[in-house]
Amino acid sequence: MFADIIGDLGKWTEADGRGTMLGGCGYLLPDGSMRGSPISWVLKERMAYLEKQEQDGYPRLAPDFIVELMSVFDDPAYLRRKMDQWIANGVQLAWLIESDPQRVTIYRAGKAAEVLENPTVVRGDGPVAGFELVMARIWG
């Protein structure tokens, strides 16, 4: 699942050219906390403003888009709070993907979370408008 998402987002990112995809990156957020996400995406223009040291370490910014994967071992309440924290710190779009049940919860700045039950495709908007994740490969 993880590798498929990284592969699809990576291909789209390269073709689109507006951003940088980062895997397993930690961020120092505006509220002072440090958060990591297995998959994140940042507009290139925002990355360009960071010092070289920050680009190689923990950037002091919130990514524009993140993807979190919920496993059977994760605490759902904790991950929902984490998603809310991402949004509160400036992430524009966040996807929480669950494999059992097959569900994607989409978080957007200034909007209520949107829950998609067993979607066939999840379409990006905002910073990743044009990105589409076909879920058949993700669900396995």
Segment roles from a protein language model:
Residues 1-140:
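Gly/Pro/Ser/Thr-rich low-complexity, intrinsically disordered segments predominantly at protein N-termini
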